[in-house]
Swiss-Prot record:
Main location: cytoplasm
Keyword field: Cell cycle, Cytoplasm, Cytoskeleton
Alphabetical list of InterPro entries matching this protein: SAPS
Positions with biased composition (Basic and acidic residues): 620-630
Annotated compartments: Cytoplasm; Cytoplasm, Cell cortex; Cytoplasm, Cytoskeleton; Cytoplasm, Cytoskeleton, Spindle pole
Compositional bias of kind Low complexity: 720-732
Protein name: Serine/threonine-protein phosphatase 6 regulatory subunit
Main function: Regulatory subunit of protein phosphatase 6 (PP6). In complex with pph-6, promotes actomyosin contractility during cytokinesis by regulating the organization of cortical non-muscle myosin II nmy-2 and thus contributing to correct spindle positioning. Also required for the proper generation of pulling forces on spindle poles during anaphase by regulating the cortical localization of gpr-1, gpr-2 and lin-5. Negatively regulates kinase air-1 localization at the cell cortex.
Phenotype of the disrupted gene, per the record: RNAi-mediated knockdown causes severe reduction in cortical contractions and lack of pseudocleavage furrow formation in the 1-cell embryo. Positioning of the spindle is abnormal due to reduced pulling forces that prevent oscillatory movements of the posterior spindle pole during anaphase.
Gene Ontology BP term (one): regulation of signal transduction
């Protein structure tokens, strides 16, 4: 047998037994990585020598590239060397790196070097470091080596490389033991990693580096808080270090823009503002808020895929009855919210300036304000109200209405209003910020003025403005109609005469243009995600661009011959758009347009379509066609005839109907005979007696071959069907009349499988063929 044979040596083993070979010859051998994983003694002994280990590490971290070689081969030896040093099946190579003096010096020199890395060497380095940090052979020896180097400085200088960014993000996840995790956290604390990240954000000159630094900070924070939510011990020194008030204040100060700051300086600072806002947003997002407005709007389920940390921060308390888990918060004192709320007036001023200057900073800042509005903290909402008064907030609404196509801006502002209106506090108080918007803030009056004023802009601009204004009104209307509405909110609205008129306008608009709004997942006013803006465009944005293209399209262009297989052109029908009435009557109806765009392509009506090519001629089709033409109209027997006192009942099956009518028994003394061209009887008398399946042996009259349309076939005996098919087309298929040895003429059914009325298999088969709809429902 094959296992009794001696194992043949491969080319690598034969090479190691010779005297004239080099390390390069070994690395270029096709079996070197495979045999290294297997731990071949001869190969391990050769590689783990001091000079070879140093050479492998030098090849991985400081390769000398021959530019004369093709690009594919320049880093070939470096890649193979890094693969050997990071083999998972054994610790022997990694242990040699941290215990051999030559390799230790090589690694220290590399980490202390300030030369920028390229993406390939960064990948080799990240892979080696991950293997070293995940091994348990001697953790203290590994960290004692790293503490002598400028590891974090080296990584932060090359943070723009994806491999380095991932290495820092996963640093607290790499160790496989709790002791290893503790050592890594102590190392990060001693090196002041978070302070270095924030300082590097200010010093960096490229926008990409700022974004990568913010992402590293956020990922480490999410990982720490994920563990805090599920661990019994809620003490984490590294998390406490990240929550240092001085550090948070330094991050928040990056959002401050002086009033006299020129537009050019604001553009230069936009990347720093966006990165800082992203970090503060992660702090607020991962701090659990009981009964948050986003939960009331049923938005959390949609964010489970992208917002991974929510599985512990928000969904876990919903599934766990442990009161301690309900009350735990990583930031119970709301430190981040307080620091940010104190700077909110300046942040709102920056948002307004950036919107008017057509900048990009308003988007991350508004997302940060949205998270601040989703906190259910009275002190925070009081500071929000103060900031709204100082701006005032209605100026943001007016600036957004000056940009009717800015759907993302509209969506974010609507979310701010929604979250404030749905915030819940003890004693059923209304958010001070929401109260300001509904009273002295002038939000209702602004919505009413826009709804009742003509707009001379283009159709697209009018429709975008109309949707934004309508969504603002819907936000107030739905807060009023909530399951448990706020009594103070109801009192404010009932005392406002403008709201009474505006409510009627909102109701009429929704009745005509959004009849199924509660099921419309494209509506940005409520159903669009509070936290996830992957579909941040509102309902108007989904069709206004398309409507513009349709309006500019010449209707005659669609009447051209589109495909040679069709003898007549398409006939577009745009009449349904002319039914729009009311304000902005020159714009198409958004609901009708969306319905039209959602129809399948094959539902378009094309009059007079025919194909010029002939269909495929199947064997036996010509004979069937000639026989069918000479046959007189026949009477079709019922699918399930019943034996009743000598009277035979017949029933019609309508051609193409696809639905079978159960057999009936007429009154005594009557016989009902229905032809194919007759009318279906209105009354059917159902016999409750046991059915008789003796008719299964009867062959039906010949009909056109419906190919695979079994819904219009009568239930007949498989034997009869096989005989009929064989007799009608035996001359068309070669060899059809020749049977194998032992094969009956009705193969695959022989005499022992004749159909009987008592055979349960035939009963089920007949029922499934005659009533496919019933069987599918069952």
């Amino acid at each position: 047998m094959f296992w009794a044979k001696e194992e043949e040596e491969n080319s690598l083993m034969r090479l190691l037994k010779t005297d004239n070979f080099t390390l390069e010859d070994v690395l270029l051998n096709e079996f070197v990585v495979q045999e290294s994983r297997y731990g071949k003694a001869e190969l391990v002994q050769y590689i783990t020598s001091r000079e070879n280990m140093k050479a492998l590490l030098e090849l991985s971290l400081n390769p000398k590239i021959n530019t004369d070689l093709p690009m594919k081969q320049q880093y070939r030896l470096s890649f193979i060397a890094s693969e050997i040093l990071t083999i998972r099946g054994t610790d022997v190579f990694q242990k040699q790196i941290v215990t051999t003096e030559e390799t230790r010096k090589c690694l220290v020199d590399f980490l202390n070097d300030k030369t920028p890395l390229n993406h390939l060497v960064a990948g080799f380095f990240a892979k080696i470091m991950e293997c070293l940090l995940s091994r348990h052979f001697d953790l203290f020896q590994t960290f004692s080596l790293l503490q002598e180097t400028k590891f974090f400085d080296k990584c932060l200088r090359n943070i723009n490389l994806g491999a380095i960014e991932c290495l820092l993000e996963n640093l607290v996840r790499i160790p496989t033991t709790s002791e290893g995790t503790r050592i890594v956290k102590e190392w990060m604390i001693s090196e002041n990693l978070f302070e270095k990240i924030v300082d590097r954000m200010r010093e960096s000159e490229t926008d990409d580096e700022k974004e990568c630094l913010a992402e590293v900070y956020c990922e480490i924070l999410r990982e720490l808080r994920d563990k805090l939510y599920i661990m019994e011990s809620k003490v984490d020194e590294l998390h406490a270090k990240s929550m240092d008030e001085t550090l948070i204040a330094k991050i928040a100060d990056n959002l401050i823009v002086e009033e006299g700051c020129p537009a050019e300086e604001l553009v230069k600072k936009s990347a720093l503002i966006s990165a800082s806002a992203k970090i503060l947003e992660a702090f607020i997002k991962t701090n659990f808020v009981s009964n948050a407005p986003a939960q009331q709007l049923e938005e959390i389920e949609r964010n489970l895929i992208e917002e991974r940390h929510y599985s512990y921060g928000l969904m876990r308390p919903c599934m766990d009855n442990d009161p301690y888990e309900h009350s735990y918060q990583p930031d119970p004192e709301r430190i981040v919210e307080g620091i940010l709320a104190n700077r909110l007036p300046n942040i709102l001023q920056t948002v307004l300036r950036d919107i008017e200057a057509n900048g990009s900073v308003w988007q991350p800042l508004l997302r940060l304000i949205i998270e601040l509005c989703n906190t259910n903290c009275m002190s925070t909402h009081e500071k929000i109200a103060v900031a709204f008064r100082s701006l005032p907030f209605i100026n943001l609404i007016k600036a957004a209405k000056m940009l009717p196509r800015a759907s993302v801006l509209h969506c974010l502002l609507v979310k701010v209003v929604i979250l404030l209106l749905h915030s819940s506090f003890p004693c059923d108080e209304l958010s001070p910020a929401a109260e300001y918007l509904l009273t002295e803030g002038g939000l209702i009056q602004n919505i009413y003025d826009t709804a009742t004023s003509p707009n001379p802009g283009s159709s697209v601009a009018c429709s975008g403005l109309r949707s934004f204004n309508q969504n603002l009104g819907d936000a107030i209307n739905r807060a009023k109609k909530a399951g448990i509405p706020n009594q103070k909110l109801l009192a404010i609205l009932s005392a406002d005469n403008t709201w009474t008129e505006l409510e009627d306008i909102i109701h009429l608009y929704n009745l005509k243009h959004r009849p199924q709004m509660q099921h419309d997942f494209n509506d940005s006013s409520v159903v669009s995600s509070i936290r996830n803006d992957s579909h941040g465009f509102n309902d108007s944005e989904e069709w206004t661009d398309a409507s513009t293209k349709f309006a500019e399209m010449d209707a005659t262009s669609s009447a051209k011959q589109a495909f040679s297989g069709f003898s007549s052109p398409f006939e577009p029908n745009m009449q349904r758009f002319s039914d729009f009435e009311g304000q902005f009557d020159d714009t198409p109806d958004e609901d009708e347009f969306r319905k039209l765009c959602s129809e399948r392509a094959n539902s378009s009506s094309c009059a007079g379509i025919s194909f010029e090519t002939s269909p495929i001629k199947w064997p036996g089709e010509a004979e069937k066609t000639s026989e069918k033409a000479s046959e007189p109209p026949s009477v079709v027997a019922s699918t399930y005839p019943q034996q009743t006192n000598g009277n035979q009942a017949f029933l019609e099956q309508e051609e193409g109907d696809g639905e079978w009518v159960w057999p009936t028994v007429p009154p005594l003394g009557e016989t009902e005979v229905v032809t194919q061209t007759g009318h279906r009887p209105e009354n059917n008398w159902v016999d409750e007696t046991a059915p008789d399946f003796s008719h299964l042996d009867m062959a039906p009259p010949k009909e056109d071959d419906m190919w695979a349309d079994f819904s219009s076939f009568p239930t007949i005996s498989p034997t009869a069907a096989a005989n009929s098919a064989s007799s009608s087309s035996s001359d068309a298929w070669p060899g059809s009349d020749i049977h194998l040895q032992g094969e009956a003429s009705d193969w695959p059914l022989n005499n022992s499988h004749e159909s009987k009325a008592s055979d349960p298999v035939m009963v089920g088969l007949a029922a499934s063929i005659s009533h496919p709809g019933d069987s599918s429902e069952a």
